Structure formats: structure tokens, C-alpha cells
Amino acid sequence: ASHELKTPLTVILADSDVLLNHSTESISSQKKWIDSIQSEANRMRKLVENMLFLAKNDANRIEISMQNCSLSDICFHCVLPFESIAFEKGIDLIDEVEENIEVHGNESQLKQLILIFLDNAIKYTPSGGKIYFKLAKIQNKPVLTIRNTDSYIPPEDLKHVFERFYRVDKSRKYQGGAGLGLSIASQIAQSHKIKLSVTSDEKQGTEFTLNF
């Protein structure tokens, strides 16, 4: 965890040094460094929030209010903002959401859970790839699947994907993730008694399945 915090701090300090050394220049001419500081600060904020969530969860200090909510509506609202992101990256986001599917749970946490998987799929799908997002009832039980093509996870890594700070591709640290997202998803799933599973195939890609 200390290493994950140290990286953005190092960037912020380096960028602020550049600004201080060019203090007579206009703000517009130094926008690149200011944007970098803001980006790294936001990255730190997200990391701290995620670490606090996991710490509270470990200490059983998270109070969750459960109620009936529309999983269909939650999925729809989660997918919507990713459509433009996928378009910009040259990714085909194909969603199929069955209507009127309800579950008992915490709407905010369910949204966070789904956003983690969508963000993960976008992050690891290259341009020209596809993401399949599907919500349907199977044997009268809601099942959500998120599959992204051109993204293969070897068997030796697959069993670790829900562990904290674990990255399958160590070379992708620059993408800003801290390896906490799927761990948080796993904790939320446990609190909602959702069964998580993942499969990966070199031809078909990687698929996460959530059985409600």
C-alpha cells in the first residue's frame, strides 16, 4: 500500500518542482504540469477511499441498508457513461439488459460493483476489441456477465485476480489502477451473497459472471 501511495506522491512533487522553477511563466504555459498534479491527486484520493473501504469492511464497520431495487435500471445507468469511453478507445460495447429484474441489496454498492467490472473491461480491452455486457434471468435467477475480448488471463494468475494489489499484467501500472478494484468487488459480492466467477480463454477473452 505504501508503494501505491508513493508513486503518485513522487509525480506530484516532481511536477510541483517544475512549476516552482518556472514560477514567472503563465499558468496556461504550465497547464501540462497542473493537469498531471490534478490527475495524480485524484488517483491518490481514489486509492485512499478504496483502502478505507477495505479497512472498514475488515473491521465489520460498514453499515449496509438493503432494500428491493431494480438491477436492470442500475445496469442501464452504469453502462451509459462507458459508451462514450468505449467509442473513444475504438471498443465495441455491446449491452443486452433484460428489463424488470429486481434484487434485494444496497443500490449504491451494487452500482459500485458493476462499475468496477466495466472499468476493468474498458481498461484491458485494446482498440478494436469488444465488450459484451449481459443481464438476464437464468432459471429465475439474475445473472450478469461481462466479457471482454483480446484479454487473456493465464491460469496461474486467474486464481489471484480478487486479491488486493494484484495485477495480472505488471506492465500496466501506468494505467492508474492500484489492484484494489476487484478485491472491493469481491467484498461487495460477499456482503450481497452474490457468487463471483471468472473464466479466461485465449480466443474468447475473459468473462466475469455474477450470480445473484
Language-model segments: which ranges?
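Short acidic helix/loop segment immediately C-terminal to the autophosphorylated histidine
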Residues: 20-27
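Conserved glycine-rich
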Residues: 193-194
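Short beta-strand/loop element within the Bergerat-fold HATPase_c
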Residues: 128-140
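Conserved catalytic submotifs in the C-terminal HATPase_c
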Residues: 65-68, 87, 92-102
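Short helix-loop "hinge" at the ATP-lid/N-box region of the Bergerat-fold HATPase_c
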Residues: 121-122
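Short conserved segment of the HATPase_c
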Residues: 153-165
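Short alpha-helical segment of the dimerization/phosphotransfer core of two-component systems
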Residues: 39-44
